[in-house]
Regions:
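N-terminal acidic leader/helix
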Residues: 1-23, 41
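Short, charged early-sequence alpha-helical segments and their helix-coil boundaries
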Residues: 36-50
Length: 50
């Protein structure tokens, strides 16, 4: 999963209160950051979700 989609899913899981998905997507995003070191455009992702 690409980091932008992972961030979207993480934010949706947080909003839904889904602890298991939140932890899973957070782990995926953390792995991506450790490999690539770059976060997706958080502001753009939030705007797409609202």
């Amino acid at each position: 999963m690409d980091p932008t989609e992972c961030l979207k899913q993480l934010l949706l899981a947080i909003a839904d209160g889904d602890k298991d998905d939140t932890v899973g997507y957070l782990q995926d995003l953390t792995e991506w950051l450790q490999k690539d070191g770059a976060l997706p455009d958080v502001e753009q992702v939030v705007l797409e979700l609202t």
